[in-house]
Structures are given as C-alpha cells and as structure tokens.
Amino acid sequence: MKTFIIGISGVTNSGKTTLAKNLQKHLPNCSVISQDDFFKPESEIETDKNGFLQYDVLEALNMEKMMSAISCWMESARHSVVSTDQESAEEIPILIIEGFLLFNYKPLDTIWNRSYFLTIPYEECKRRRSTRVYQPPDSPGYFDGHVWPMYLKYRQEMQDITWEVVYLDGTKSEEDLFLQVYEDLIQELAKQKCLQVTA
C-alpha cells in the first residue's frame, strides 16, 4: 500500500505542532509523530562550556526510537487496507512527522513525499519562546547562547538538501498557514492517487 509522508520542520515556536494537528483534523487517514516525544532524559543531555544543556542537537533525541515508531506506522499502514468502505480503502495513509531537527537526519532523507519548513524572525522567535514553559526551564541567556545559534547551524546544513522543501512564513496566521499547506497537500495527494491508479 502506498503511503504519503509529510515533514514539518522549522525553528522553535514557529507553529509546527499546531500546523500538524490542524492538518491531522482535516486529512483522512492521517497520523502524527512528534519529534519532541523522543527527547532523552535530562540526565543524558550534554552541557556545553557555558553550562547550557544541549537540547537543540540530534544527540539530545532518541532518533533510533523515533525511526522505530515510523517503521511501525509504515508496517501497519501496509496492512490496513481492509475496509468495506470503498472511499476509505482508496485513501492513502498519511503520516505527518513534525520536529525541529528532521531534514538534517540522513536516515529520513528518502521518506519525504512533501517537506515544509517554518521560519520566523529572531525577535518573534525569542518573544514566543519567552511565553512558553519548558521543563527544565530556559536559563538566562539560553536562547541567544544556544537555541538560536543551533537553529542557524541547522539552516546552514539544509543548504545541502537535494529534495524540495517548501519554506513557510511562520508569522502568518494559523488559518493562513493551514490553508496554504492543506491546498498544497490536496494537489500532491491527487497526483499520488493518479500514479497509484496507473501503476
């Protein structure tokens, strides 16, 4: 069974989770995996020379466990073809993976059917981050000393990506972002269904 996998990445507090949840509500046969669910325990997080916990790096995440969750979803999607409803039987299983470090993790490179990256300016990102409660809480200087520099490093690494990434303006309203991505996905899914019929 054909599947359709969407990546939604971007800077911290850019609206990735909100967008993923809104899409899940409106796309048939859709599941979401959130990278934030795969952080290692605080005791396993490295500290840099400034004393900042290194949460904004791949090493802070249990990516093997996340890959296992993706594989389980793909396996169950292949076996979920049994349906008495003709229309749902034709629906392509959709998986949205959302997280801040998706597109520079090589094992994921080949799975994306559509990739989106949310951006917001430094000041807006810092403002949004200051309104959120984190466990453990951000220490003074953490955003400027660790979070933003790691985002800039990640953006630089994305220059080497060989597939298409759609960049989104995270300062747009929740509704505008949803509509932009939803309309794009409906077109992409229609193409996939045509390919499925002709295959």
From Swiss-Prot:
The lineage of its organism: Eukaryota, Metazoa, Chordata, Craniata, Vertebrata. ATP binds at residues 10-18, 128, 132-134, 172-174. Signal peptide: none annotated. The gene is NMRK1. The keyword Nucleotide-binding applies. Changing E98A: Loss of activity. Gene3D superfamilies: P-loop containing nucleotide triphosphate hydrolases (3.40.50.300). Changing K16A: Loss of activity. Pathway: Cofactor biosynthesis; NAD(+) biosynthesis. This is Nicotinamide riboside kinase 1. Mg(2+) binds at T17, D36. Monomer. Catalyzes the phosphorylation of nicotinamide riboside (NR) and nicotinic acid riboside (NaR) to form nicotinamide mononucleotide (NMN) and nicotinic acid mononucleotide (NaMN). The enzyme also phosphorylates the antitumor drugs tiazofurin and 3-deazaguanosine.
